Amino acid sequence: MTPSLILRVLLLGSLLSTSTTRVFAQTLVERLGYAPGTKLLIVHADDLGETHAVNAAATKALQGGTINSASLMVPCPWFPEIADYAKSHPDGDFGLHLTLTSERVYYRWGPVAPVDRVPSLVDRNGYFHHDWNEGEHIDAKEVEIELRAQIERALAMGVRPTHLDSHQYRLIMNGKELFDAMLRVAHEYKLPVFVTRDWFADHPYLQASLGPNDIVLDHTVTIEPEIPPKKWPEFYLIALKNLKPGVTEFVIHPGYDNDELRAATRERSTWGSAWRQRDYDFFTSDQFREILAQQKIKLITWRELARAAEGK
């Protein structure tokens, strides 16, 4: 090989290497077609289907346009109501809030799959465990059976989910085996999973399990129990003013503080009825709309993320 040919080969290799690096270094924002530095936000309502009060508040907020994404709890008593709404709003951004626990004292739910196929997931009464500490062992194979059952029921009732997430993060933050079970099911149904880089440090198996085509958000924000009720708007305003470039999801829990929701959640103040009313009030307020405009924050949905994952 002549010196000039060697030089050309080396230059070509360098160019190919640079090109490949650029592809892999491309941020999620760029994959979505936005300029680097753009602040993109998903305002995501959890727990739809749990009660009528949650469904009513969330759907009103979705119609107002400031809450623009949600996920549905298939095993819960009020899922049929929200499934009908999702079916009649096919352009809406509705994921499935994959559910394997039933944390309420008196307001309970259980698996979609037959109990005898998922015995490790239920208590002696056939409900999901209040907490997984109650179960001696959660069988990952049974988890997959139940996840498929929840997705299939949603599909049968006319819901076309845009993404998957996990109630109480049970499938995300309880080890690689369960996360991999969720990821296998997600890939089977060609659905993105809500995962954020914020979680990688504490749960390194997440990054190890994810492939190059999986969607990974940059940041997530959710309010914590130590925030006093009077400081609720301040917490969210500070978070929005300090929003970093990239794709962030605000995980919120809207609902109406009424007799139904107070009865369903009466054993706890965190994520209870008044908590959910505060979330609803802030995210439907003019104050929220104004700061979005002031900070040049653009709302996006999981539909856009799914298209990016497909390369469309």
For each predicted feature, which ranges?
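N-terminal pre-catalytic segment of deacetylase/amide-hydrolase enzymes
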Residues: I6-L11, T21-I42
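Acidic (Asp/Glu)-rich catalytic clusters
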Residues: R31-G33, A58-G64, E81-D93, G110-D123, ...
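Structural preference for beta-strand elements that scaffold enzyme active sites
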Residues: L40-I42, I67-S71, D91-H97, P161-D165, ...
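Active-site beta-loop-alpha junctions enriched in small/polar residues
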Residues: L48, P75, H97-E103, H167-Y169, ...
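A short alpha/beta connector and helix-capping loop motif
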Residues: A53-P77
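Active-site gating loops and adjacent loop-to-helix segments of metal-dependent hydrolytic enzymes
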Residues: W109-E134, A264-W271
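Catalytic domains of cell-wall/extracellular-matrix polysaccharide-remodeling enzymes
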Residues: A140, E144-W232, K241, D281
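C-terminal domain-boundary segment and adjacent tail
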Residues: V193-T196, R268-K312
